[in-house]
């Protein structure tokens, strides 16, 4: 099983967050399922902004090392085409969300987890389920 994590989940995992209990539940479920966590190169870019703004080379190195162990999905030509399809059919879909969903779609994932409940209403080819963190943490 492949589970795509949207950027906000990494923030909840690595920073002191009220969503910590939900993240722990999701991690426990993923371990039971022997799930592979995947994300896109956009996630890494988004996560590095704040540490770079604060000149925190230690956090840049820490995040980079963590992502070196993970499968990162590239925003390639196929993802760019899928991105355009998503944006053309879902007018309110923000560009970063469309980019993440396009990467997940072209890579083929079983579950896409985000904290944006609006995304969980979408059905995207190549993505089995889209769930908000609260819903994903309660999966059987």
Which residues fall in each region the model found?
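Short, well-structured N-terminal submotif of metal-dependent ribonuclease cores
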Residues: 1-39, 51-62, 117, 131-140
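Acidic, PIN/NYN-like endoribonuclease modules and their adjacent C-terminal/linker elements
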Residues: 2, 72, 101-140
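Conserved glycosyltransferase catalytic-site signature
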Residues: 7, 41, 97-101
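A generic structural signal for short hydrophobic patches within well-formed alpha-helices
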Residues: 10, 44, 80, 119-120
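Short beta-strand scaffold positions
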Residues: 38-39, 74, 95, 114
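Acidic catalytic patch
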Residues: 69-90
């Amino acid at each position: 099983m492949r589970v795509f994590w949207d950027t906000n989940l990494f923030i909840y995992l690595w920073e002191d967050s009220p969503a910590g209990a939900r993240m722990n539940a999701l991690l426990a479920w993923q371990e039971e399922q022997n799930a592979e966590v995947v994300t896109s190169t956009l996630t890494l870019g988004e996560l590095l902004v704040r540490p770079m703004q604060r000149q925190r080379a230690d956090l840049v190195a820490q995040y980079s090392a963590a992502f070196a162990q993970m499968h990162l999905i590239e925003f390639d030509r196929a993802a760019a085409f899928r991105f355009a399809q998503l944006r053309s059919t879902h007018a309110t879909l923000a560009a970063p969300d469309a980019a993440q969903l396009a990467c997940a779609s072209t890579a083929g994932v079983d579950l896409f987890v985000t904290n944006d409940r609006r995304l969980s209403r979408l059905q995207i080819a190549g993505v089995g389920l889209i769930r908000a963190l609260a819903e994903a943490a309660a999966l059987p």
